[in-house]
C-alpha cells in the first residue's frame, strides 16, 4: 500500500460522524428500550422535555445519548411510529456497534425504505477539512450522485424535495472562484442555492440536498 493511501485511510478512521436513520414499524419508546438492552445499560427515558420531538433516549456504556425522535415526514401507521434514530458523535470504531443496533431494531419490526419517506443522513465532522477539501467533496458527490441515488433507490418524490441533487449554479461558481476560506465557501453555498436569507436557521432552504454543506 502506498504511503499516501495509508495516510488517507488513517485520517478517514479519525473522521467523526453522526448518523440519522428514519424508520417505521417500531415506536420510539420500544426502539429506545431495545437500544438500552443492547448497550447493556438498561437506561432509557422520555427526554422530550429537553430534546423536543417526542424524544426517547437510550445511553450506551460510554455514557453517550442515542435519541429516537419523531419525524413527521415519515409515512407510518401512526405518529408513535414516526421514528428517527439520531446517534451521538461516532468514530470509525463505532460503525459495527451502529450496524448491530440497526439489526436488532430490524428484528424487532423496524423498517426503513424510500416508499415510506425514510432516508439516512450522515453528518461529517468538520475536523481538519478546509474549503479546498470540501470543494473536492462537492465535486466527488456531483460526479457520483446518480450512482448513489440508484444504489439507495431514493424515491423520486424525495429527490424533488428532501434529496435534491447538487445545484449546478453552486457547483459552477464553486469551481470558478475556488474559495480559500470557509466563510467564502459558505457564501457560495447559500447564495448558489438561493438561500442567503435565514442562513443561520436550522431549517434553511439549502438543507434539502443529497449533499448539504452547513
Name each model feature, range by range.
Residues 122-124:
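Active-site beta-strand/loop microenvironment that shapes enzyme catalytic pockets
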Residues 116-120:
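Short, conserved phosphate-binding/catalytic loop or strand-edge motifs used
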Residues 1-114, 127-214:
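C-terminal accessory/tail domains of diverse enzymes
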Amino acid at each position: 500500500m502506498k504511503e499516501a493511501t495509508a495516510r488517507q485511510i488513517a485520517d478517514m478512521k479519525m473522521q467523526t460522524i453522526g448518523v440519522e436513520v428514519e424508520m417505521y414499524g417500531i415506536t420510539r419508546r420500544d426502539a429506545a428500550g431495545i437500544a438500552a438492552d443492547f448497550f447493556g445499560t438498561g437506561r432509557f427515558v422520555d427526554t422530550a422535555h429537553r430534546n423536543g420531538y417526542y424524544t426517547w433516549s437510550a445511553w450506551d456504556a460510554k455514557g453517550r445519548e442515542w435519541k429516537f425522535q419523531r419525524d413527521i415526514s415519515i409515512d407510518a401507521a401512526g405518529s408513535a411510529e414516526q421514528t428517527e434514530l439520531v446517534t451521538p458523535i461516532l468514530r470509525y470504531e463505532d460503525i459495527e456497534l451502529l450496524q448491530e443496533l440497526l439489526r436488532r431494531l430490524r428484528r424487532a419490526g423496524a423498517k426503513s425504505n424510500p416508499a415510506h419517506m425514510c432516508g439516512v443522513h450522515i453528518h461529517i465532522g468538520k475536523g481538519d477539512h478546509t474549503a479546498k477539501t470540501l470543494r473536492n467533496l462537492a465535486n466527488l458527490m456531483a460526479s457520483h450522485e446518480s450512482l448513489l441515488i440508484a444504489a439507495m433507490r431514493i424515491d423520486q418524490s424525495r429527490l424533488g424535495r428532501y434529496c435534491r441533487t447538487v445545484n449546478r449554479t453552486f457547483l459552477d461558481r464553486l469551481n470558478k472562484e475556488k474559495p480559500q476560506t470557509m466563510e467564502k465557501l459558505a457564501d457560495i453555498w447559500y447564495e448558489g442555492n438561493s438561500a442567503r436569507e435565514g442562513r443561520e436557521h436550522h431549517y434553511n432552504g439549502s438543507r434539502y440536498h443529497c449533499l448539504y454543506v452547513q
